[in-house]
Regions:
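An N-terminal boundary/leader segment
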Residues: 1-93, 97-100, 317, 327, ...
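Structural helix-boundary/capping segments
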Residues: 1-5, 72, 209-308, 326-338, ...
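Acidic-enriched catalytic cores of C-N bond-cleaving enzymes acting on peptides and small amides
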Residues: 2-23, 269-289, 313-348, 365-379
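Short helix-loop capping/hinge segments that flank enzyme active sites or metal/cofactor-binding pockets
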Residues: 24, 28-32, 36, 117-140, ...
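Serine-dependent amide/ester hydrolase catalytic core
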Residues: 46-53, 310-313, 366-469, 502, ...
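Short, well-ordered beta-strand elements within core beta-sheets of diverse protein domains
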Residues: 48-54, 123, 141-145, 262-269, ...
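Immediate post-signal peptide segment of exported/extracytoplasmic ligand-binding proteins
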Residues: 95, 99-120, 291-303
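Short glycine/serine-rich loop/turn segments
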Residues: 115-262, 305-307, 442-455
């Protein structure tokens, strides 16, 4: 047993309990973004494409509608870092001109075969790089820096006809479970403005769930697509590593494990849109996923776990989330899936395995470097004192990330090696079991926590583990609309490498049961 982990876990549990009344007071008002009035903003990506192609809806009209909604909700959620509204409108008008000509020439279908997202607006996580827009990734030392090129996934979406509207907020260098930084401030959950939108793709999730974007290009290194999607009632897919290009992503690490842990993926409001978005974002690699191959749910084996750990270093999963995982598993059984009661006991040390493998990367960014002089490292305690007094160059969670990275949960070298060995065994076991199946697991220990409730940050281990296992996974909402005063609850659907289509097929089926995305109010 890792005794220091146990002690730290006990302290966090006690502290979380002591602070619970304070956070309850902060979230009791349950303020939300303004209601979504424009019915066009509820359309799926597929429906937008269909209506643009038929001429029922113009690219300019839908782009204008999304811009108006962004301007309406951003003062509440603080998700936008920099926009390109004028350029987007110009591009939309040009698309409409080209489509009118294609209709006259009888080539409208050809236009959409070449560009399957032609005229559809979308948004981009700042770290994924959009030409000419901010690329500071929440860091004071990079304030004013602009992206010189599009990131690989963004370039693929633009080549498919997508029209980018803006870049959205992230924590410093994407190293956080909450989207906050000293440069751009804190992004808020549209379902309850006193709660977290998750991280590190919280800006994307907050916009999309507000009805301010049909889909977004985001990234996931420890749950950064799935956790915000879960907190905001959306579908977020972390693909098999290497499928979608990560070129241009900030930060970039040289360690070989980085390209296995980091993936770029879509966040969307409708599960049915995920295959189309994956196909576009992946480019030529999409064929490896066989997304067009039908999935017979009767041949899919379903495993499920309501709690993946007995580690005292983690706070227990909420009862509501456990019940939803069981409900999802039973529904899939009723749909003809084979339901397995086998449990993967290796998950007992999910936190220790995740941390041991993740922090084994060699060049993780040092959040204590002085923004004014990167050769100087600031003292952790002095910087913490500055932050406590309302100053400092980093957010609280950036400093907590530094503590976690340097301490590695105070695990000994021998313990870390043991946990990495257990992780390898679990990976081999899951790759075999999930070759024709999926594993249902909570996406987090709770629904969206109050802003700043860092005592619950360890819950990110549920998503981080999937990254270090190098597996694909989809976050899916499991109660829609969430019963007031709750924020959305979600689970994640995990499968073996290159079996992404199984995750998505199950997510689409569960959308029928739980209702999928439901906007605030």
């Amino acid at each position: 047993m890792d005794f220091i982990v146990v002690i730290v876990g006990l302290l966090l549990r006690v502290l979380d309990g002591l602070l619970a009344p304070y956070y309850w007071l902060r979230t009791r008002r349950h303020r939300q973004v303004p209601p979504l009035q424009d019915a066009r903003l509820r359309l799926s990506v597929a429906e937008i494409v269909e209506r643009i192609q038929s001429g029922e809806l113009s690219s300019e009209a839908i782009t204008c509608a999304y811009i108006a909604r962004i301007q309406e909700v951003n003062p509440y959620i603080n998700a936008v870092v920099e926009d390109r509204f004028s350029a987007a409108l110009a591009e939309a008008k040009q698309v409409d001109i080209l489509l009118e000509e294609a209709r006259r020439n009888g080539k409208i279908e050809d236009a959409f075969k070449k560009k399957p997202l032609l005229g559809v607006p979308f948004t981009v996580k700042e770290s994924c790089q959009l030409t000419g827009l901010s690329n500071s990734v929440g860091c004071l030392e990079h304030a004013g820096r602009k992206a010189a090129t599009d990131g690989g996934a963004v370039a693929n979406v633009r080549a498919a006809g997508g029209i980018p509207l803006l870049v959205s907020n992230t924590p410093e260098l994407c190293l956080g479970w909450e989207t906050t930084n000293r440069l751009n401030g804190t992004t808020r959950n549209p379902y309850c403005l006193a709660r977290s939108a998750g991280g590190s793709s919280g800006g994307e999730a907050a916009l999309i769930s507000s009805g301010a974007s049909p889909f977004g290009v985001a990234s996931d290194i420890a749950g950064s697509v799935r956790l915000p999607a879960a907190y905001c009632g959306l579908y977020g897919h972390k693909p098999t590593p290497g499928i979608i290009p990560i070129a241009g992503h900030i930060p970039t690490l040289q360690d070989a494990k980085y390209s296995e842990f980091l993936t770029v993926g879509p966040i969307a409001r409708h599960a049915a849109d995920l295959p189309r978005l994956l196909d576009v974002m992946a480019g030529p690699n999409a064929k490896l996923l066989r997304l067009d191959e039908p999935v017979d749910l009767r041949k899919v084996k379903v495993y499920y776990m309501t709690e993946a750990t007995k580690s005292i270093g983690l706070i227990d999963v909420d009862k509501r989330i456990k019940e939803l995982v069981v409900s999802a598993a039973r529904y899939l059984r009723d749909c003809g899936c084979e339901l397995s009661e086998e449990k993967f006991t290796e998950f007992d040390h999910v936190l220790e395995m995740s941390v041991s493998e993740f922090f084994s990367m060699k060049d993780i960014p040092n959040m204590l470097l002085d923004p004014n002089d990167p050769k100087v490292e600031r003292n952790l305690f002095a910087e913490a004192a500055r932050v406590a007094c309302g100053g400092g160059a980093r957010s609280v969670q950036a400093l907590l990330f530094t503590v976690a990275a340097r301490s590695q949960l105070f695990l000994t070298h021998a313990a870390r090696a043991r946990h990495r060995d257990n992780l390898d065994k679990l990976r081999r076991k899951l790759e075999t079991a999930l070759s024709d199946g999926v594993l249902l697991l909570p996406a987090s220990i709770t629904t969206a926590p109050a802003l700043g409730r860092h005592t619950r940050a360890g819950g990110a281990a549920y998503t981080m583990l999937v990254n270090v296992l190098r597996l694909p996974a989809t976050a899916a909402p499991a109660d829609s609309p969430p019963p007031a005063p709750h924020t959305p609850a979600a689970l994640q659907i995990i499968s073996a490498p290159y079996q992404d289509r199984l995750c998505i097929a199950v997510a689409r089926e569960l959308e029928k049961r739980f209702g999928g995305w439901s906007p605030p109010h």
